[in-house]
Curated annotation (Swiss-Prot):
Organism of origin: Bacillus subtilis (strain 168)
SUPFAM superfamilies, alphabetized: Fe-S cluster assembly (FSCA) domain-like (SSF117916)
GO biological process, one term: nitrogen fixation
Name of the protein this chain belongs to: Putative nitrogen fixation protein YutI
Family (UniProt): Belongs to the NifU family.
Tree of life domain: Bacteria
Keyword Nucleotidyltransferase recorded: no
Functional note: May be involved in the formation or repair of [Fe-S] clusters present in iron-sulfur proteins.
Cell inner membrane among keywords: no
GO molecular function terms listed in the Swiss-Prot or TrEMBL record: iron ion binding; iron-sulfur cluster binding
Key words, A-Z: Nitrogen fixation
Stored InterPro entries: FSCA_dom_sf, NIF_FeS_clus_asmbl_NifU_C
Coiled-coil ranges from the UniProt annotation: none
Amino acid sequence: MCYNRESNFANQTIDFYCYTEYNGFMTTKGANVMTEVEMKEQVQEVLDKLRPFLLRDGGDCELVDVDEGIVKLRLLGACGSCPSSTITLKAGIERALLEEVPGVVEVEQVF
């Protein structure tokens, strides 16, 4: 549950207080508010940068959805059946998305 104290929608910055069951109250000042469409576009850009590395090993990935910061990906080709796909997903793709796309909290594989 979040409560807006001050908003500046022209710059899409917001100062709000948020209560979560995980970490209690927290304050975020000047956080960028990104639409779901913008987040999907940024996620796709990062995936496009990573794609050559996946293709080199005979694999690929497809963006299925982004919902509340959770990126859902389908691993394709060799990546779909590779025993190392979890490592590729978590240590490679998820790490890159967490670093480069604000608001991403997790990456999940869908089948």
